[in-house]
Structures are given as structure tokens and as C-alpha cells.
A protein has these predicted regions:
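Short, compositionally biased
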Residues: 2-168, 244-256
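Short, conserved beta-strand segments within well-ordered enzyme catalytic domains
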Residues: 105, 173-174
Length: 256
């Protein structure tokens, strides 16, 4: 298993043009959010944090075209802010970030599974350098290529995405590094939304999130929250599966 650290600071490069959200905060804005979240036990619904605190956190979330990070996409095609009483039956997914001003929508349910069980030819471009891999937002293209591939090459992570809400006639895909890293960049807002609505899954530090991006034909990239709030990316050997199971998050093809 390999690792590539791209940044050593507590937040990612504030000038990044590929991911938005927490990483685009000024230091003053970041300090404000950090003060709000530093004492929260995200996995303990009975801790002292109040709903007002989570609402205050969400006020700092990035907004594009009247849609905010951590808003929910409803079955009727509208977006709504996190609020109590929101039913899972009415929700398609949650906004985890933006790319080219289009919202990246993630499923409420997370799955486990790795990209591959064996060595194979790559589905898309190979990224040997992590800094380049973080610029990849082609998960939709790669997933479509996989879907049209050979039946004997069925892999866990792709299948979880292709089969999610299959009866709804929606197109879900396995995210590339840029898309998955964008989601992890915004974990504070997503967790705050979860604590208000009780929908979805808490994003924890140390959890491994698989991507469809490959380092080469033998290794795939995954994302993990380490060192405070920023995600780093790592690679695992697909043949030996030393990593074990990764978390898979289906993302939705959605264009405004």
C-alpha cells in the first residue's frame, strides 16, 4: 500500500480551482468554523452540541446558483436545506460539493468494496502523481466505460454504484479522486446536516473511500481524512487487496 501526501497544512491549497468548499475559506473563516466544530463528538447524538450549532455551521457552506453544500435533492427535483422531519423516502441524495458549478450529489447510503480484485488494463487515464489525480473529475465517464465492458470484469465498487436505486432509472457512478476528495473536503457540513436530519452516514477520520481513478494497471487511488480536516490520497495494490474493503459512495449524474 502506498501513500502520497500533497499538503502538510491544516487545510488544502486555498487557491485550488478543482475543489471548493472548506478549502476556499480564508484563514479567518476557517478559524471560525474550527472553533464551532472542535468539541463535537460527531458519532454521539447525545453530546452537548445543539441543532443551532449545526445550523450555524451550515451557514458557512458554499452556495452556487442558490444551492448549498449539504442541501438535499428531493424526488420532485427540488433542493431543500437540512431540517428535522425530512423523510428518506423523499430524498434522492445530498450535495457534497460542486464541479463546474454543477452540484455533486452523493447517495444517502454508503457501501463497502474495492475497485478491483485483480490486475487489469486501466479504464481511464492513469495518475502516477497524487497532485494530478486530485484534478480528475471523470468518474461518470469511467463508470460508463466500465458499464459497457466485459461481464467477467465486474468489480464490487462499480456494481454498488450501478445498482443503487436502479429501479429509479437514475445514473449513479463511482467518483474519481477529485469528486471523492471534494466530498471529504466538505465533511463538516455533511456531518452537520446528518446531525439535523439523521439521514445518511457520518464521515469519520481514518475511513477509506475508494475511487475509480488508477495509478496504473496494478494500483488504485483512495481518499482518507487525516491530519485535521483535509483529505489525503493513497493507493492500494489491486492484486493483493492489502487494503481490505473501502467505503463506496455512489454519486449522481446531475446537471443544472
Amino acid at each position: 500500500m502506498g501513500v502520497e501526501y500533497s499538503y502538510n497544512s491544516i487545510i488544502l491549497d486555498a487557491n485550488s480551482k478543482t475543489t471548493k468548499g472548506i478549502i476556499n475559506m480564508s484563514q479567518e473563516e476557517y478559524n471560525k468554523v474550527y472553533e464551532l466544530i472542535k468539541d463535537i463528538n460527531w458519532n454521539n447524538a447525545d453530546d452537548k452540541a445543539s441543532e443551532n450549532l449545526f445550523e450555524e455551521i451550515l451557514e458557512n457552506a458554499q452556495e452556487v446558483n442558490s444551492i448549498r453544500i449539504a442541501d438535499y435533492l428531493l424526488e420532485n427535483g427540488e433542493f431543500t436545506k437540512p431540517h428535522k422531519g425530512l423523510s428518506e423516502d423523499d430524498v434522492v441524495g445530498i450535495v457534497v460539493g460542486f464541479h463546474n458549478e454543477n452540484p455533486i450529489i452523493a447517495s444517502l447510503k454508503f457501501f463497502t468494496g474495492v475497485f478491483d480484485r485483480k490486475y487489469n488494463s486501466t479504464f481511464g487515464d492513469s495518475y502516477y502523481i497524487g497532485k494530478e489525480a486530485k484534478k480528475a473529475f471523470d468518474g461518470q465517464i469511467i463508470t460508463r466505460k466500465y458499464k459497457n465492458g466485459k461481464r467477467e470484469d465486474r468489480f464490487e465498487a462499480f456494481e454498488a454504484c450501478l445498482n443503487y436505486r436502479k429501479n429509479k432509472n437514475e445514473e449513479w457512478y463511482l467518483g474519481a479522486v477529485g469528486e471523492v476528495a471534494t466530498m471529504l473536503n466538505n465533511w463538516v457540513y455533511l456531518n452537520a446536516a446528518h446531525r439535523i436530519t439523521k439521514l445518511g452516514t457520518i464521515i469519520n477520520h481514518g475511513d477509506c473511500y475508494t475511487t475509480c481513478s488508477e495509478r496504473d494497471s496494478t494500483c488504485s487511488w483512495y481518499c482518507q481524512l487525516v491530519r485535521a480536516i483535509n483529505p489525503d490520497i493513497f493507493w492500494y495494490d489491486k492484486g493483493s487487496r492489502k487494503l481490505g474493503d473501502c467505503i463506496v459512495v455512489p454519486l449522481l449524474v446531475y446537471n443544472i
